[in-house]
A protein has these predicted regions:
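Catalytic core of pol beta-like nucleotidyltransferases
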Residues: 1-34, 39-59, 69-171
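Short aromatic/hydrophobic contact patches that present stacked aromatics
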Residues: 66
């Protein structure tokens, strides 16, 4: 996993350093903070303003951040995210400012998913940038899956999501 954000503009590096500081202050159980997604791949969109069919639209990439803790945050997760975001936006003037998006995972569940070859976590490990590590834990090795395992993961994912969709449609 990469550890440098030096390829990003100074303003983005400042934002990420500030987010790391805020996260570490808000979440004492934090063992790793990982940037993933478009900013980690250096394929982000800073601000794309378009006018299509008479409507002005804006698109901006967000900071995708995986917060790894000893135990999942559980029910307080969204309250913590709201506090972090609120503190991050203090003294920021522009309405078009890069927003952080968070997910939380326990180190044990993250490592289990890496060992199982779960694609989402594999991609985070492959393309992500370690912004902070307590050095208490190491990430597990990603395992290559055979076709049967890939097919089973796809079936399980479909079953879970299809059930949610069915429940939603049926009320």
């Amino acid at each position: 996993m990469k550890s440098s954000i030096n390829f990003l503009p100074a303003e983005k590096r400042r934002d990420l350093h500030q987010l790391v500081e805020i996260i570490r202050n808000e979440i004492k159980d934090c063992v790793m903070i990982i940037l993933y997604g478009s900013y980690a791949r250096d394929m982000y969109v800073d601000c794309d303003r378009r006018r299509d069919y008479g409507v002005t639209t804006f698109f901006m990439s967000d900071y995708d951040i995986l917060i790894v803790t000893r135990r999942r945050l559980g029910l307080k997760e969204y309250d913590v995210y709201a506090r972090i975001t609120e503190r991050f936006f203090e003294n920021k003037q522009s309405e078009f400012y890069t927003r952080p998006q968070f997910i939380n995972e326990s180190i044990s569940r993250l490592n289990k998913n890496l060992e199982l070859g779960q694609y989402f976590y594999h991609e985070i490990k492959k393309q992500g940038i370690m912004l902070y590590s307590s050095r208490e834990f190491k990430l597990a090795r990603c395992r290559k899956l055979n076709y049967a395992e890939i097919a089973q993961i796809a079936r399980d994912y479909f079953s879970e999501k299809f059930q949610f969709a069915s429940d939603f449609l049926l009320g």
